[in-house]
Each structure stands twice: as structure tokens, then as C-alpha cells.
Amino acid sequence: MLELKDIKKYYTVGGTTTKALDGVSVAFRKQEFVAILGPSGSGKTTMLNVIGGLDNYDSGDLIINGKSTKNFKEADWDAYRNNSIGFIFQSYNLISHQGILDNVELGMTLSGISKAERRQKAEDALIRVGLKDHIHKKPSQLSGGQMQRVAIARALANDPDILLCDEPTGALDSETSLQIMALIQELSKEKLVIMVTHNPELAHVFFKQKTAYEILDRDWSS
């Protein structure tokens, strides 16, 4: 479904070049729950950004459903991000003065579907993440765990093939983190879910060894 072939990414600042990704090769399957482990600065978020089309790679290839992205134009990346990828971050990125239903709808602004369909998809997504009784509330009326559920609903609303999660439990307490992880794990039964974390203890609770890749040691064998 998704494959990275010898992906390299460099950043140059003030004449100094840093290797963020140095020849990463790994393949992911649909209905897989994958953890990318490593400390801050090891390249985890860079890898997630490359997979999500938020950042360009310098060499190698990203293969999506058997298709190379080497010659992708910006319009191709836009279509990929809008239709195939759902992003979940540590920060909820919710607009405080709008209701959570409107927040979820905003994620579908560029999808080209009608207002009525956006509203229905948003409602369905919020119900799916367990917020049926909170649909008409604003973010300020919710707990941290509930706000992260809104963010997950926003990522789900367009029914993407891939969910990319960057430290999704980083701002939550231990009990709430486990609840959110259980929800994300459930979603992996029908989607490819790739999660970045620097917390090996949390990862080892939810991931089998073969689906946890240690980016620090560049061990990309499956």
C-alpha cells in the first residue's frame, strides 16, 4: 500500500547540512498499526511529514499503491493529502469559538462535497469517536481527551486510507492516553495507522515487535 525506498532528507541551516532521514526503506500494509520510535530530533516527524506529503524528500521514492511520486506535481500532492491522508497531532488545533461540529467540517473544506454532506460526515465521525452527546459543544467545554477525540474525528471525516499520528497522546494523562490509543488501535482494523512516539513503554503496550520500528538505530527490517 505504501512504501519508502531509500528515502533521504537533508536540512541546511547556516551552511550546516543535517541528515534527517538517511536511506529509509520500509513498506506498510493496509490495516496495520505501526509505531515509529525514537527520541526528539531522530527524524520521526520528518518521516511522517514525507509520508503525508507535507515535506519533500531529496532522493529515493515514496510509492503509493504501486505508483511512484517522483514526478508528482503540487496538484497531485494536494489530492493525496486531501483524499488519502488524515493527520492527528499532539496539539488539537481546534478553533475555540466554533462548535466541534464546525471544527470537524473545516477539515473537509477542500473536499469538493456539499455543505449538507460535510455536516453528515462530521456528525458520523464524532459519533464514531464517542462524542454523540457532545456534538453541539465548543472545545472549551471538553476535556483534553475529548478534544483529542474531536481531532481524530476531523481526521476521519473524509474517510482517508492512512492516518498519521504525531505524538497524539503527548498532552494527555496516562489513563486518557490509553483510551485514545485504544481508539486509534481500533481504527487500524480498516486503515493503515502510523504513529510517531518517543514513549517506548506506551508503544510496547499496543504494538507487536514487527510493527515497531526504531528510527534511532535505523532498523527498518520487518
Predicted regions span which residues?
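ABC family nucleotide-binding domain
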Residues: 2-203
